[in-house]
């Protein structure tokens, strides 16, 4: 059993590593404007920094979760930190956008390897108040996601966009040194290549990644001229992926769940919609603030704090509401506030004073905070008890799919320039997403009533 001091050091080692994925997924939002202008890119092209990160995370997290079981969690955790360190050192000196994109992929894969390894290390070595220990990781992740844009804004003022990569180094060094010292040596030797290939659905992974990449390229091409062949290839690969997952014993994504668990499927659909909505704001607003409203990167970051700050404040309150009343009412309230916020954003945001803008963003933050916590609780409530690990992994995949879809929407809307008309169009899309979330919330309430 770990002493109180050793437990704190162990958790610090894990948390300072696992926070890197949410921190880097959100800090980039304030840097897109600077990177776009430095490399002379369209928004469509620079948006690949968003979509590629989430696509790599969607593939890497479940894969590295299995790899940790096979080759050892300490080994994989430290290797993930090394990959993120490579990106932190290499990205600031990237001579081309393609080099920067590769560094961003290193960052995504490395930070994705750290999270499942960190959770596994806590489950194996912290047995007293384990739920509290895991809650620390959740709090760190939520705080980093929410505060990333604001922190990124101040870092960019200090050292330009390279600063958002360099800032990772102190956390990497801290996590690596503490982990090297605190984490027990892996019990098992590293598995062989043949064993790893047998345990991983390599074909499923390739079909999934290939299908998403081709569809992304097809959808983003709408800002210029549509690449129909890529769209057809993407659909064919995804159809082949579904067929493969239905046939194999160890699927990359267990698509059977969508057919057998209707309540859970409704949660997944709502979570995708929530993340499309949120990440359109998360990545779209900073670019609009800087390009069209000509606000400084620092001011843009402070504006984003209205939304992210309220989502942090409302999250623990939502947990208490769920404990008293269940998940149905908070899910509906979150969808209602999202829709109302989107309407206010579209109609009034451009013309109101600063306090009005802050209130609208705060309302949107409350809606997201309610939905995010309530849907996580609903996922756990509707999951079969023997499949929580699988359903939790799929839940994260839905987050990444929503994020990827938002980057496509923004790439199409803001492809050549960012204007008030494009902002209004984004607002209309968000109203549609909010309305769909409301309908799904009503549907979910009916399903839960039938189940009870």
UniProtKB/Swiss-Prot annotation:
Keywords: Cell membrane, Membrane, Transmembrane, Transmembrane helix, Transport. InterPro entries: MFS, MFS_dom, MFS_trans_sf. Disulfide bonds: none annotated. Pfam families: MFS_1. The chain crosses the membrane at residues 8-28, 39-59, 77-97, 100-122, 134-156, 161-183, 203-222, 226-243, 266-286, 302-322, 330-350, 359-379, 393-415, 425-447. The keyword Transmembrane applies. Its main location: membrane. It is found in: Cell membrane. GO terms for molecular function: transmembrane transporter activity. One of its GO terms (biological process) is transmembrane transport. GO terms for cellular component: plasma membrane. It is a multi-pass membrane protein. Belongs to the major facilitator superfamily. This is Uncharacterized MFS-type transporter YwoD.
């Amino acid at each position: 059993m770990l002493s109180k001091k050793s437990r704190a050091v162990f958790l610090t080692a894990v948390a300072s590593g696992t926070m890197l994925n949410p921190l880097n997924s959100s800090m980039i939002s304030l840097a897109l404007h600077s990177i776009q202008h430095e490399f002379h890119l369209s928004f469509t092209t620079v948006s690949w920094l968003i979509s590629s990160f989430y696509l790599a995370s969607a593939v890497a997290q479940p894969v590295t979760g299995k790899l940790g079981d096979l080759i050892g969690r300490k080994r994989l955790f430290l290797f993930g930190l090394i990959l993120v360190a490579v990106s932190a050192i290499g990205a600031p000196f990237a001579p081309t956008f393609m080099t920067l994109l590769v560094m961003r992929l290193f960052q995504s894969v490395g930070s994705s390897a750290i999270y499942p390894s960190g959770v596994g290390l806590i489950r194996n070595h912290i047995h007293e108040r384990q739920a509290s220990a895991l809650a620390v990781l959740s709090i760190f992740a939520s705080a980093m996601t929410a505060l990333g844009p604001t922190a990124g804004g101040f870092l960019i003022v200090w050292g330009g966009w390279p600063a958002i990569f360099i800032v990772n180094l102190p956390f990497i060094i801290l996590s690596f040194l503490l982990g090297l010292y605190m984490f027990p040596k892996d019990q098992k030797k590293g598995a062989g290549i043949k064993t790893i290939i047998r345990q991983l659905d390599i074909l499923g992974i390739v079909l999934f990644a290939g299908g998403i990449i081709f569809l992304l390229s097809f959808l983003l091409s709408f800002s210029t001229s549509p690449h129909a062949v890529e769209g057809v290839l993407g659909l064919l690969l995804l159809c082949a992926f579904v067929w493969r997952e239905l046939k194999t014993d160890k699927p990359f994504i267990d698509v059977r769940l969508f057919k057998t668990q209707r309540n859970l499927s409704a949660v997944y659909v709502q979570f995708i919609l929530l993340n499309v909505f949120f990440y359109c704001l998360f990545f779209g607003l900073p670019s609009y603030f800087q390009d069209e409203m000509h606000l400084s990167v620092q001011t843009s970051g402070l504006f984003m704090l209205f939304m992210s700050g309220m989502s942090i404040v409302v999250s623990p309150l939502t947990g208490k509401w769920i404990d008293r009343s269940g998940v149905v009412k908070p899910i509906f309230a979150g969808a209602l506030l999202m829709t109302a916020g989107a309407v206010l954003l579209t109609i009034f945001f451009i013309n109101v004073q600063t306090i009005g803008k802050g209130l609208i963003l705060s309302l949107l933050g409350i809606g997201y905070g309610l939905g995010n916590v309530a849907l996580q609780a609903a996922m756990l409530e509707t999951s079969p008890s023997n499949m929580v690990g699988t359903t939790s992994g799929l839940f994260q995949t839905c987050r990444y799919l929503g994020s990827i879809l938002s980057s496509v929407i923004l790439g199409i809307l803001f492809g050549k320039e960012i204007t008030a008309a494009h902002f209004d169009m984004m607002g209309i899309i968000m109203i549609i997403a909010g309305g769909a979330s409301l309908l799904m919330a009503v549907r979910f309430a009916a399903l839960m009533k039938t189940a009870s």
